[in-house]
A protein has these predicted regions:
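Generic hydrophobic/packing signal
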Residues: 60, 72, 77-78, 127, ...
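Generic secondary-structure transition motif, activating predominantly at the C-termini of alpha-helices
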Residues: 12-19, 166, 170, 187
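Histidine-centered divalent-metal-coordination microenvironment in nucleic-acid enzymes
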Residues: 66-74, 119-154, 158
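Eukaryotic intrinsically disordered and solvent-exposed regulatory patches
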Residues: 44-48, 55-60, 122-131, 178-187
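Helical (often loop-to-helix) elements that flank the catalytic cores of nucleotide-handling enzymes
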Residues: 81-110, 137-183
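Short glycine-rich, low-complexity/disordered patches
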Residues: 23-26, 108-125, 171-189
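DNA replication initiation on ssDNA origins
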Residues: 1-102, 111, 115-119
Length: 189
């Protein structure tokens, strides 16, 4: 084990958080743990993390979202496995679906918030390919609106307004998830 990984592991062990307790970061791969790093120690964590990454160590920590942050969206699409006849799993949504979704978000955001036109930017990220998971086909996109900074209550409100338009924007063939499961609320807080 490298020195960088040992140093990071010792630091992480010092701030390990029990399930259900306050946390600042979680690891989404082995070991799956949560940590609660004090603000005054956070730069040390980032430096140790950077050293480990540049040393070739694969790490998968996420940060707990802050109450005031850019609008974030996680759309989780699930499809019946039998809806994919061919050997290769193909994507069921297309660019037109993504444009419709992002456009609907912008319409809702701009209707309820006073947003400068230059702030109407969205970044859309997607997995390279859909995957099979628990006998379903799993796919989805993440969207971030980097210049539209709001609190979590506003993000929940926007999510509610999106769910009201779900029939229009999630008209994707063979989708088998309900809108409340598609628009993941866990990304908000």
């Amino acid at each position: 084990m490298s020195v960088a990984k040992n140093d990071l592991q010792a630091f992480i062990n010092k701030y390990k958080s029990e399930k259900g307790k306050a946390f600042t970061n979680t690891s989404i791969a082995n070991p799956r743990i949560s940590v609660n790093i004090p603000t005054e120690c956070y730069d040390t964590f980032l430096n140790l993390y950077a050293l480990a990454i540049t040393g070739g160590i694969s790490l998968y920590f996420t940060e707990k979202p802050l109450d005031i942050s850019p609008i974030r969206v996680d759309l989780d699409f699930r499809f019946s496995k039998d809806s994919h006849e061919d050997k290769y799993i193909t994507r069921k949504y297309n660019d037109a679906h993504v444009h419709k979704i992002v456009d609907t978000y912008f319409k809702i955001i701009n209707y309820y918030l006073d947003i400068d036109e230059k702030s109407n930017i969205a970044y859309v990220m997607e997995k390279p390919n859909p995957t099979e998971f628990r006998n379903k086909i799993k796919d989805g996109i993440h969207i971030i609106f980097p210049h539209i900074i709001v609190n979590n209550n506003i993000q929940y409100f926007i999510r509610t307004k999106i769910l009201e338009k779900a029939q229009e924007i999630f008209d994707i063939t063979d989708i088998c998830a309900i809108p409340d499961d598609i628009v993941d609320k866990a990304i908000i807080s």
